[in-house]
């Protein structure tokens, strides 16, 4: 699977948060003052939500997409000593083009 060895189920995705260490002004933000990142990259996506008749709804996001998500979205997990979020596709606010 590449970066992660977990396959998300249903409409879940695994997102690698993109940390913003330095502000545009060049000020470095200490860890204690950082807010949770709200931008990330999808590193794995499930097959889609299973419908009542057994059909799969197609996923709107795919591996490699840069996404915006809510500040408190998802469940934080550590995989191979890196932090990721597992969330439902519905937690994604938009895809960055």
UniProtKB/Swiss-Prot annotation:
Its main location: cytoplasm. Signal peptide: none annotated. One of its GO terms (cellular component) is cytoplasm. Keywords: Chaperone, Cytoplasm. One of its GO terms (molecular function) is unfolded protein binding. GO terms for biological process: chaperone cofactor-dependent protein refolding. It is found in: Cytoplasm. NCBIfam families: PRK00364.2-2, PRK00364.2-4. This is Co-chaperonin GroES. It comes from Elusimicrobium minutum (strain Pei191). The lineage of its organism: Bacteria, Pseudomonadati, Elusimicrobiota, Elusimicrobia, Elusimicrobiales.
